[in-house]
Amino acid sequence: MVYKTKLGEMEISDESIFTFEKGIPGFEHLRKFALVFPQETFPIGWLLSLEDPEVGLPVVDPKLVRADYDPVVPSEDLEEIEAENQEALLFFCVLTIPPGKPEKTTINLRAPIILNQKKKKGIQTILENEDYQLRHLLSEEMERSKTVV
């Protein structure tokens, strides 16, 4: 089906669509989102609202940025997306890219987007891990990851 999104009109397949029962913080009124990876921004993907074409969040797999990323998800959040455990879930972290200053991009490692591919449900959670913050400088995290691997 074709949707109007923040990135323009896009053909989006059903397998890319996820329901967020409580929305996403700041966008609680929106429930349907699609995860897409346009070639021109890969490996950065986009979580696009299918209800408001102005809403789209740049996201990235946190393991690409921080190799030792090991989130502890609250059990009530696993229940909300009908997940038995964390193993089959997809994790993405939201990027904040300041206009004209991509070198100042930050990643939110504390509140990842978690997707249950099987049930097509998603949630943005706040992790119990104390060492993850809402804003980590992307370049510093990638540099740090080189020493961890």
UniProtKB/Swiss-Prot annotation:
SUPFAM superfamilies associated with the record: BH3618-like
GO terms for cellular component: cytoplasm
Pfam families: FliW
Alphabetical keyword list: Bacterial flagellum biogenesis, Chaperone, Cytoplasm, Translation regulation
Protein family according to the UniProt entry: Belongs to the FliW family.
Record NCBIfam families: PRK13285.1-1
Entry protein name: Flagellar assembly factor FliW
Organism this protein belongs to: Thermotoga sp. (strain RQ2)
